[in-house]
Amino acid sequence: MDCDGRMVKAIRTGVNVLDFRRWPITVCINTKWNLIYLMQKSFQTRMATIVVQTEINSSLDKAWEIISDIDNEPKFWKGTKEVKTLSTEGDIIKREITIAFRDQKCLQEIQLKPKKEISAKFIKGILNGTKIITLTPNKEHITMETVWEIKLSGMMNMFTGVIKNHIKSGTEQAMQSIKKEIER
């Protein structure tokens, strides 16, 4: 590949040049696996958005007590196998989580906003994006909402759409487990 973004066949004939500058694709090189592949530009930035809500009949204090215990995440979230807190700086918690998908490790930054929200940002690993859990008190109940803006990193990016339904069903199951625990 030369500096103008053209890929030249191994045997240069002067004619066999593909010009990708105006195509909606990117030439990607994976040095670990010695692969050259083409990726549609729309796949590179496509995030899966998942929104799940549930109503909880409980006090805000009790709901916050359960969801803010982030070390207990594997108890409710079946996609999270293990969590390990690495450091705490102010209201930011850095931790390593092991997810159920091929026991992959991801680095997260968690920010707790007491009795309002938990924001988890995936900063390294197979997942990129955020998971935000919000508590909104109403007169009779509390609305708990989880919003994912997520995609798979690297070459796995093309499978983001495939795993969206899997993450959504896991989130629905987790929300029901959390609701059951809070309402006990």
Which residues fall in each region the model found?
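Hydrophobic ligand-binding cavity/cleft-lining segments
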Residues: 39-90
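Hydrophobic/aromatic beta-strand elements that line small-molecule binding cavities or substrate pockets
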Residues: 54, 106-111, 130-137
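Glycine-rich portal/gate segments that line the openings of hydrophobic small-molecule binding cavities
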Residues: 74, 84-127, 143, 173-184
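Beta-strand/loop substructures that line and gate deep hydrophobic ligand-binding cavities in soluble
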Residues: 123-173
